[in-house]
Amino acid sequence: MPFTLGQRWISDTESELGLGTVVAVDARTVTLLFPSTGENRLYARSDSPVTRVMFNPGDTITSHDGWQMQVEEVKEENGLLTYIGTRLDTEESGVALREVFLDSKLVFSKPQDRLFAGQIDRMDRFALRYRARKYSSEQFRMPYSGLRGQRTSLIPHQLNIAHDVGRRHAPRVLLADEVGLGKTIEAGMILHQQLLSGAAERVLIIVPETLQHQWLVEMLRRFNLRFALFDDERYAEAQHDAYNPFDTEQLVICSLDFARRSKQRLEHLCEAEWDLLVVDEAHHLVWSEDAPSREYQAIEQLAEHMPGVLLLTATPEQLGMESHFARLRLLDPNRFHDFAQFVEEQKNYRPVADAVAMLLAGNKLSNDELNMLGEMIGEQDIEPLLQAANSDSEDAQSARQELVSMLMDRHGTSRVLFRNTRNGVKGFPKRELHTIKLPLPTQYQTAIKVSGIMGARKSAEDRARDMLYPERIYQEFEGDNATWWNFDPRVEWLMGYLTSHRSQKVLVICAKAATALQLEQVLREREGIRAAVFHEGMSIIERDRAAAWFAEEDTGAQVLLCSEIGSEGRNFQFASHMVMFDLPFNPDLLEQRIGRLDRIGQAHDIQIHVPYLEKTAQSVLVRWYHEGLDAFEHTCPTGRTIYDSVYNDLINYLASPDQTEGFDDLIKNCREQHEALKAQLEQGRDRLLEIHSNGGEKAQALAESIEEQDDDTNLIAFAMNLLDIIGINQDDRGDNMIVLTPSDHMLVPDFPGLSEDGITITFDREVALAREDAQFITWEHPLIRNGLDLILSGDTGSSTISLLKNKALPVGTLLVELIYVVEAQAPKQLQLNRFLPPTPVRMLLDKNGNNLAAQVEFETFNRQLNAVNRHTGSKLVNAVQQDVHAILQLGEAQIEKSARALIDAARNEADEKLSAELSRLEALRAVNPNIRDDELTAIESNRQQVMESLDQAGWRLDALRLIVVTHQ
């Protein structure tokens, strides 16, 4: 290898050193200085891992002074090169630049530059890069992007709402599904879609204080969204880092109380430029025209500053018309400004609901009914659709569905309000109550008497809370070492029940973490019962492990002991037996407890066991819940209303359980009130709204389509290949689970989403739902998205050389495989990837420019090739550099036609879809005032920007592979 002082070379093994200069040569060695790092390297002359850097006419080079030049001619004299060309800054022509004055920080980013500089990748990395481009492009084009990656069951009504709302510009909607139907999941799906598509980047979630951790856990476990929890302490800390503390995080959860307590804090929240606000339990925001509550005003102020708002609330009729109007007013104050007008409007929806019911019934329609439908929809060209709907043809059903869809678009609050009820959604289990009355131990009787004397000044509410948990009263007097479990009959009963039902998974819930911990110890020590514990003092990872142990069928825990707060946000559908060791203070908490098992998808009827002590607040409460509200065996939408109305009386009975006079009358009154309210709710159901929210057959088809995509085996093969190349260890644990751990030779030292201890993953949705410690891997999971980003944002796999053993071709025949990418640059929120994601175009050219890609499929061809080591590859490249340049020019001439076809198709699709959406909403605007002006303006602006961006779309060479034919 001829070396001359002043020549520029690059290291094949340490390309990060930049451009080296030959500074010393003797008979056996050569020394290179790398000025950008100041390091020297000594190599053997005969076989050194370095490549000569030589540029060609057409290349752009940079001098060590920073100016750039377009090369027009290359001269060689005594082994040194001089480049002649035109300076780009001054446009001076005929400028000469000797190679010794080239910029030493030279980075080869173009695939051809890397190839000619000897920066040759392994063959498997080239294949991975092409697959990453191909799959990435396909995923952007897939329908339902953003709906496939969450760890949830594929429940049609949830998918329907999320699909509708998640694609809107700055959605402002009210989610009012009945309890147990998954409002939190619907909100999470909408957020996931908006964040994934770039429609939103900053999200604020405001919830009651008791639900903060539930939301934090749900967003992380189900959607891989890492929210930051802001409380007083976190807010104070963040003030050191930014003028506005909320600018330090993109995704934030805080409590309503935290938001409204300080005027400055509320101002900071309003100024933080969020894209989306989510408010849970919005029915607690009290409003009247004369006196809106402080909480309501705080949310109103925030909603004015934010483009998108999701309000989650109990069913509207449960709360009265005024309360319902107040919620809608937060979403669109211009549309919902007059309560009296709103009440009048609601009455007018009855004929529309009747018309929908008539269409869905499938009976023949009279002329009067057809005329009425025509008037309601108000379209000129609807006659053929009406005739089809009334015919016996195969199209009748789809025509009726289309008419229903048109009616719902044009009437009611269906664009701003979604509400599903249990009556309209199938798949819920029955609930059966088993009460076990137990004697009150003398130890507790004594403790309660003493407590009554000493706590005479306590309020009735405090006494009532004490009386619910007699073991805590006993411990107050006997100290922490008091062994209440030795005489409490509930413990005896629990042990007996568990030992006689060893094969059943049982969820035991108690109010306090200390009780759960003490029960675990007793069950383990006395009966050897395997029990996992779950309480608020544990980290999310510890809770995941406990839940996973409980979920294991054969070797797992038989029992999961949960505290009230610890179990928030967790569901255990695989269990159907629940023991309430004590009772919660209000009906909402009771429903929350039962809701751990009573979910859609629960395969068995739920058995609720309540062991209670007679003559205690527990005996009062169990009767009131069951006989007064029927709250154990059915969901109780009336519970909170009745609880509030009888609160004082109920508290007095709980505080003094021995005073039973009048209690039967209270229960009777509550039951009557419950039945009346329930009938009122049923009568007030908005069938039109339920049909729209449920989604019907369309929602079912959506769920089935996503289920089909779940079976995509390409993902598993690609993910394993990707993890291999990144350098992540994989250990197959069986049961469709794999443990990933970092290795010492990763492409990056710290891979996002992979902790030091490693993670467990699964590609199976059912396994992910049963095993909380296993992450559900889809194309939308951060692990895959970060991996794709790592490969595609750098130059991994962008240049390689392979040998093709094929005796049908002459030795030394050259082929060049080119991977071009056609793409358009635009802000993420334009969601340009719907129409033109970065799309790979593969070409396989011979030296005459014949493109063989259509005849030679990538994977088949890839299997026929053999790798070349880097050093041999560099020599091969140097030998055929001129030929490769010529083939590259032929490729540049051919790519334009393919790229233009892709860009034109994307323009046509974008224009058609966005114009159709705009026309539809403009037509509806005439009959449905729930379509906001800003939504129409945004769609038109979005359309213009998308078309402009597509006009400027281009293409570039992303990767190339040089193939040399050999016979050996």
UniProtKB/Swiss-Prot annotation:
CDD domains attached to this UniProt entry: DEXDc_RapA, SF2_C_SNF
EC number(s) reported in the record: 3.6.4.-
Gene Ontology MF term list: ATP binding; DNA binding; helicase activity; hydrolase activity, acting on acid anhydrides
InterPro entries: Helicase_ATP-bd, Helicase_C-like, Helicase_RapA, P-loop_NTPase, RapA_C, SNF2-like_sf, SNF2/RAD54-like_C, SNF2_N
Domain of life assignment: Bacteria
Motif DEAH box boundaries: 280-283
Function comment: Transcription regulator that activates transcription by stimulating RNA polymerase (RNAP) recycling in case of stress conditions such as supercoiled DNA or high salt concentrations. Probably acts by releasing the RNAP, when it is trapped or immobilized on tightly supercoiled DNA. Does not activate transcription on linear DNA. Probably not involved in DNA repair.
Annotated protein name in UniProt: RNA polymerase-associated protein RapA
Source organism: Shigella boydii serotype 4 (strain Sb227)
Gene, per the UniProt record: rapA
